[in-house]
Regions:
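Alpha-helical recognition domains of nuclear gene-regulatory proteins
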Residues: 12, 29-30, 161, 210, ...
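C-terminal effector modules of eukaryotic transcription factors
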Residues: 297-565
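Alpha-solenoid repeat junctions
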Residues: 38, 138, 188, 239, ...
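Short amphipathic alpha-helices and their capping/turn residues within compact interaction modules
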Residues: 18, 32-35, 42, 135, ...
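Charge-rich, intrinsically disordered regulatory segments
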Residues: 1-124, 151, 551
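Intrinsically disordered, low-complexity acidic/Ser/Thr-rich segments used as protein-protein interaction/activation
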Residues: 76-94, 98-313, 317, 321-355, ...
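Amphipathic alpha-helical interface elements that mediate macromolecular binding in regulatory proteins
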Residues: 8-11, 28, 156, 205, ...
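Short coil/turn segments at secondary-structure boundaries
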Residues: 42, 142-145, 378
């Protein structure tokens, strides 16, 4: 019980040390002494409810008759650390997102324009789509498959909310809605590759439908034009892979965007559209060999492909002194060693620049292999055809071009993969576990033709390390898959393709190594995986070639709708 807070005597009686009758407003002693009766202010009672001990005992006695079931532990509403979704988004922003203004470097693609989704509400479709992507890649680096169990719920809610938003006209015309569909499509491709799930085309088709709702391209915002540019690049690579022409509507979008920009990447997409056209024309001619086709048509097509290749060479010459490639030599002994074919290694100003130059090489390889197939097929039915081919389209010239392009892709592998010899984890970001070649290692840099380089868009060493770690092996998947499919695809065509001694086994080994670096399981033989990752005590060449041939079909399917970020 609490004590009585009333004072026992007035201050005057306390000072005189006499007994006080505690009468108010003035006690009897003060009245007799004609003194001012002063009282101390009462002490405020604490706002605490005191319970009599007998009541507490009685309460415990009554409850003891009942069986006590402990409550399960609960997560506090306001935890002292960030939840896993917040950690995943922070990791994604720090290590995946590229600068939207690369200071003279190539345009960054999808990962340079996702900040609006990151900044949006966590419960919006864009916010949930970025959460799904972030949780998926974070689970890969954290090596925690339990995180992926949260993704279907987030993904399903994003799609459900997006479907409601699409019923509103303003939402259909929103840049953020288009970004959401692009992120959902990218997530589908990631899951297809990393977790062997079926890739879907529905989000890609949805993005195309949204662009049609945008109206006249001349009224699009700058960010909308960037998103459409990503879609155009996807359509171009898809058309080349499927040996068809690009849809007329996509061509129209590209023509309008091209009239308002001088971006070299957008011009490269223009050239890619023409590459798809040439490939389609060649396929149609091959089907009509000896039936309603003439040598003049073949000569004209070969000449057109040669002129287009010259445009691609000119494009490379214009950007190479700014973005690379530049020859690189190691500044010191590196362990584990960087795996390079015959010691050849090229560096670029960024991982994104390496990606764009390999896009160019893939276009030129498509033209070269298409020309070579056309010459071989028509040479069988018309022996005098090969003798009358113009010099620039001769078999020897095309073979030399293919070899040079293959060498270029091989020389970009060390830049993207460095000396990595195991699948990545979060520890790789806390300490510089691996070494990646960079422009910072060189005092002087020269372009393809001996001209002094003028590098633009050079990433800092820390940014290059994180981007090479997270995106280098991912971007090399399509390039190495292209080479493996080209060399191991058509058995009748393989003998005509050039390859240096030991180059095909090296390409297959790097392809399998790249699968392991991305934590994509391709065999149950852990010893074989270790040999492929380290490059030491490798199995015979026929084993590497056989394993790569078996795996390339699955990866190629997973890459079908993927736009490299």
């Amino acid at each position: 019980m609490a004590d009585d807070a009333r004072p026992r005597a007035c201050l005057t009686c306390k000072r005189r040390r006499i007994k006080c009758d505690r009468a108010k407003p003035s006690c009897a002693r003060c009245v007799l002494a004609v003194e001012y009766c002063e009282w101390s202010k009462p002490v405020a009672r604490p706002k605490i409810r005191f319970v009599d001990s007998s009541q507490a005992v009685a309460a415990r006695a009554k409850s003891s008759e009942k069986q006590i079931t402990p409550k399960p532990p609960t997560t506090p509403k306001y935890a002292l650390h960030d939840d896993l979704e917040t950690q995943a988004i922070a990791f994604f922003v720090r290590n995946y997102i590229l600068d939207s203004k690369p200071n003279g470097g190539p345009t960054p693609g999808l990962f340079g324009h996702v900040m609006p989704a990151v900044s949006s509400s966590r419960t919006s479709p864009a916010g949930m789509s970025i959460s799904a992507v972030a949780l998926t890649v974070f689970s890969k680096w954290r090596m925690d498959q339990s995180l992926t169990k949260r993704v279907p719920g987030v993904l399903g809610q994003a799609i459900k909310t997006l479907s409601h938003d699409l019923q509103k006209k303003d939402s259909r015309h929103s840049d953020l809605t288009l970004l959401t569909t692009l992120l959902l499509q990218y997530h589908s491709a990631v899951e297809s590759l990393l977790f062997s799930k079926k890739s879907t085309i529905v989000h890609h088709l949805g993005a195309l439908a949204l662009v049609r709702e945008f109206g006249n391209p001349s009224t699009w915002s700058a960010i909308a034009s960037e998103f459409v540019g990503i879609l155009i690049h996807l359509e171009v690579t898809k058309a080349i892979r499927e040996q068809r022409t690009v849809h007329p509507e996509v061509r129209y979008w590209r023509s309008i965007i091209g009239a308002t920009t001088v971006d070299p990447i957008r011009y490269l997409d223009d050239l890619g559209i023409q590459v798809a056209d040439m490939q389609f024309r060649a396929s149609a001619l091959q089907e009509r060999i000896g039936i309603g086709s003439s040598l003049e048509e073949v000569y004209l097509l070969l000449d057109d492909m040669h002129k287009l290749d010259e445009c691609l060479v000119l494009w490379q010459g214009n950007v190479s002194r700014f973005w690379g490639p530049f020859n690189w030599t190691p500044p010191s002994i590196i362990f584990p060693p960087i795996q390079a074919f015959q010691g050849s290694c090229h560096v670029y100003t960024s991982i994104n620049a390496a990606r764009r130059l390999n896009d160019l090489r893939s276009y030129r390889l498509t033209l070269a292999t298409t020309s070579l197939k056309l010459i071989r097929e028509w040479g069988k039915s018309c022996p005098e055809f090969c003798e009358s081919i113009p010099g620039h389209s001769s078999v020897h010239g095309i073979v030399s071009r293919i070899q040079w392009l293959v060498d270029g892709i091989c020389a970009s592998v060390p830049f993207c993969l460095g000396n990595r010899s195991r699948a990545g984890s979060l520890l790789d970001f806390n300490q510089a576990s691996w070494t990646f070649p960079t422009c910072h290692d060189m005092s002087e840099m020269y372009g393809l033709y001996g001209r002094l380089a003028e590098p633009m868009g050079v990433e800092s060493p820390s940014d290059h390390y994180s981007h090479a770690l997270t995106q280098g092996s991912w971007l090399m998947l399509s390039n190495l898959a292209l080479l493996v499919a080209m060399f191991l695809g058509s058995k009748a065509f393989i003998p005509a393709l050039p390859v240096r001694e030991g180059q095909l086994p090296w390409i297959c080994q790097q392809y399998l190594r790249n699968l392991s670096l991305n934590a994509i399981e391709w065999t149950h033989d852990s010893l074989l995986v270790e040999k492929v990752l380290t490059g030491a005590n490798l199995p015979p060449a026929n084993v590497l070639i056989s394993e790569a041939s078996r795996c390339v079909r699955r990866v190629s399917r997973g890459l079908q709708l993927r736009d490299d970020p």
